Amino acid sequence: MAKDILFDVRAREAILRGVNILADAVKVTLGPKGRNVVIEKSFGSPTITKDGVTVAKEIELENKFENMGAQMVKEVASKTSDVAGDGTTTATVLAQAIFREGAKLVAAGHNPMDIKRGIDKAVGAIVAELKKLAKPTKDKKEIAQVGTISANGDETIGTIIADAMEKVGKEGVITVEEAKGLETTLDVVEGMQFDRGYLSPYFVTDPERMEAALNDALILINEKKISSMKDLLPILEQVARAGKPLLIIAEDIEGEALATLVVNKIRGVLNVCAVKAPGFGDRRKAMLEDIATLTGGRMIAEDLGIKLDTITLQDLGRAKRITVDKDNTTIVDGAGGQQEIEARVKQIRAQIEETSSDYDREKLQERLAKLVGGVAVINVGAATETEMKEKKARVEDALNATRAAVEEGVVPGGGVAYIRCLKALDGLQLSGGEKFGVDIIRRAVEEPLRQIVGNGGLEGSVVVNKVKESSGPFGFNAATGTYEDLLAAGVIDPAKVSRTALQNAASVSSLMLTTEAMVAERPKEEKDLPAGGGMGGMGGMGGMGGMGM
């Protein structure tokens, strides 16, 4: 298959055209006065969004060379979204500015490798300055402010996220679900919850709510199936003598064993409830060990040399309260030792650091939350499906931004933090053409502020100069159109988001600047189909004989 190849200036011009098309579509969404973008869907209603990465992901260009440029900037937005969860539009604006300025210098004959080194030095200096500028998030109010800004000024979302974080802690899991009604609400589940319900409705103790409630209960955690009553009998007799309720968690409980438990429950001999173990395969084993650690019991597993018919009450876990409905089991206030729980938490944290799979990381994070905090669910309500999709995306963005703020602190928002970091570029030791790379960054970091102001219908240059002349957190609040102390006004960005956006934008733009050739497949030429031939003549329809009337 023959390929098309572009060299030198023509290659960079094609990249720039692609970068501009994508960035111009994305950057209209930046800031409190940013506009919406409507995206056609192959089925259902179109999506209306103000989320940069959602817009970027939808863009594919017809020209293959321009499309390569667009895809590289899309990578900037996606990577920023993956790492920091927000800041995708800022990253796109920065990438466009860095590449546009750099392409002019390379076209004028400057060495792109010198420029790249200058860009790297400048970004390193600004990132170090951002870290100095960042202040830790102290209270719920600041977390709510970060959430509000990331949710495009929606205070209810900011407040709900701050409430959720306060209730489940930094390590807690916060999930976003679609609500049935119009209201956006917060549900918090304390303790350890997993998605398995009772194996028989006969275990229910509260018929009105259809749930089994066990107070001050014992917990039997078994890795394998239980089908024979013979194995269970010894421990059941001990539990009956102790007069305490019992929860049995096993891979499955069936046949004779389940029937006997149900009969004993109905007769009032034993207050018992049986549920299947959560998860599958190795993850199931790990989750059962988590439950054992949390409740101070042992997991009954044959590979550990523990048999079901030899265990005593000492091997069972304990919890103050257990609630089981048809879908979920919640264990509150387990009797596990604090040291053992902390050791388990440390182990899970180490696994989170090591894993490269996003799915595994998410599941490990959930296990961690169940051990240390709890789980909060934000139910997003809206009037229509289109509004629901848009609002849910905003809540997820805001949630990611608040997590980033808790992690690395906050800096003044509205593009001001970058301008306050410019002083870090003055003392850099530079050689040769590196100065041009630093100048590119010096100009590029003004771009987010210019764009925020431009989207608000004002002149960017005037505002940039006024902000440069001042110091500290003083800047332009685009939501109100006033100059003020942005930290006091609650216009703040997570330092992690600002840092990641600049690093990713500079990384990809530098690569594009040092591109000397581009190779793409030639578009296939559609051959004109020959005109369709007429239908062959239909043979004569033999004489039909005289049709007498």
UniProtKB/Swiss-Prot annotation:
GO CC, one annotated term: cytoplasm
PROSITE patterns in the record: CHAPERONINS_CPN60
Enzyme class: isomerase
InterPro entries in the record: Chaperonin_Cpn60_CS (IPR018370), Cpn60/GroEL (IPR001844), Cpn60/GroEL/TCP-1 (IPR002423), GroEL-like_apical_dom_sf (IPR027409), GROEL-like_equatorial_sf (IPR027413), TCP-1-like_intermed_sf (IPR027410)
Record's catalysed reaction(s): ATP + H2O + a folded polypeptide = ADP + phosphate + an unfolded polypeptide
Positions that bind ATP: 29-32, 50, 86-90, 414, 477-479, 493
Signal sequence extent: none
Enzyme Commission number(s) from the entry: 5.6.1.7
Subcellular location: Cytoplasm
Molecular function terms, GO-annotated: ATP binding; ATP-dependent protein folding chaperone; isomerase activity; unfolded protein binding
Gene3D superfamilies: GroEL, GroEL-like equatorial domain, TCP-1-like chaperonin intermediate domain
Keyword ATP-binding found: yes
Domain of life: Bacteria
GO biological process: protein refolding
Keyword list, A-Z: ATP-binding, Chaperone, Cytoplasm, Isomerase, Nucleotide-binding
Family: Belongs to the chaperonin (HSP60) family.
Binding partners and assembly: Forms a cylinder of 14 subunits composed of two heptameric rings stacked back-to-back. Interacts with the co-chaperonin GroES.
Classification via NCBIfam families: GroEL, PRK00013.1, PRK12849.1, PRK12850.1, PRK12851.1
Function: Together with its co-chaperonin GroES, plays an essential role in assisting protein folding. The GroEL-GroES system forms a nano-cage that allows encapsulation of the non-native substrate proteins and provides a physical environment optimized to promote and accelerate protein folding.
Protein name per its UniProtKB record: Chaperonin GroEL 2
Lineage of the species this protein comes from: Bacteria, Pseudomonadati, Myxococcota, Myxococcia, Myxococcales
